[in-house]
Amino acid sequence: MFEGVFPALITPFQRNHGKNLDLDGLRSNIAHLVAAGVHGVVPCGSTGESATLSFAEHEQVVEVTMDEAGGKVPVLAGTGSNNTSEALRFTRAAKDVGADGVLVISPYYNKPNRSGLIKHYTAIADLDIPVVVYNVPGRTGQNITPDIIAELAKHPNIVGVKEASGDLGQISTIIELTRDEDFAVISGDDNLTLPILSLGGKGVISVAANIYPRPLIEMYEAAQKGDYETAREIHFKYSPLFRAMFYESNPIPVKKAAEILGMAAGPLRLPLDEASEQTTERLKEVLSRYD
């Protein structure tokens, strides 16, 4: 179910005092992505500024995403927290509105031990909804090692991992250890998507696909056909864009790029701030290559 190109959706905000949700803008962005042919969407992830959404806003974003994309493409809702009871609450809410699955970041700051991690994910998976583990040690301060992923993959509801460690050796080991399970290893880094696909990965949860979905889709489709020459050409053409998405902390650059391209984006919520003037000019230069 969770294979292909899944944009990690930005959450548009209004440029008012409260920086309220721009739900019409969210709908417009989702409709554009679905029409472009994405294989699924991910609301309320890191790119969606989930850390600064209230519980009610989190519910609203998932509900609107389901209303706009549900039945057209799978919706994988971000429901992670460093508090297991809160992650369970987010997950129940996503399940109640019909999300196809949930993306659950590993608990950040707490640094749980092995048994704590396994119990955390097991409690969420026991809610009887497909769970994709999200490993991003650069944000959480802790790496989920391949042996832990392999153990989690034995749970029938833990169906994949979004791997954003940046370590191809580790990712290769995870694919090796989970080959006998119905388990998807998904890239969490646009620039590593092609190498991960070549190892047997199943797709990407993408930042860049918010603004340029078609190249990612075409690269994925070429790789699926074994046409790695075409896939490499696309990869190298868009690598500058992939790198540009991290000129500053995600999602600062992608929201600015979306704004430049006329999409709904709006401001960021503190502690994230607007892209610097230098970043904005660098983004404009990179985007101009793809006009």
Curated annotation (Swiss-Prot):
Pfam family, one: DHDPS
Active site as annotated: 134, 162
Reaction(s) catalysed by this chain's protein: L-aspartate 4-semialdehyde + pyruvate = (2S,4S)-4-hydroxy-2,3,4,5-tetrahydrodipicolinate + H2O + H(+)
EC number: 4.3.3.7
Pathway(s) where this gene product acts: Amino-acid biosynthesis; L-lysine biosynthesis via DAP pathway; (S)-tetrahydrodipicolinate from L-aspartate: step 3/4
SUPFAM superfamilies registered for this protein in UniProt: Aldolase
Subcellular location(s) per record: Cytoplasm
Signal peptide from the UniProt entry: none
The UniProt record lists the keyword rRNA-binding: no
SMART domains to which the protein is assigned, alphabetical: DHDPS
GO biological process: diaminopimelate biosynthetic process; lysine biosynthetic process via diaminopimelate
Keyword Amino-acid biosynthesis tagged: yes
Superkingdom to which the source organism belongs: Archaea
CDD domains per UniProt: DHDPS
Keywords from the UniProt entry: Amino-acid biosynthesis, Cytoplasm, Diaminopimelate biosynthesis, Lyase, Lysine biosynthesis, Schiff base
UniProt-annotated binding residues for pyruvate: 47, 205
Main subcellular location: cytoplasm
Family: Belongs to the DapA family.
Subunit structure: Homotetramer; dimer of dimers.
Summary of the function given for this chain in its UniProt record: Catalyzes the condensation of (S)-aspartate-beta-semialdehyde [(S)-ASA] and pyruvate to 4-hydroxy-tetrahydrodipicolinate (HTPA).
Protein name per the record: 4-hydroxy-tetrahydrodipicolinate synthase
Species this protein is from: Methanospirillum hungatei JF-1 (strain ATCC 27890 / DSM 864 / NBRC 100397 / JF-1)
Gene designation per UniProt: dapA
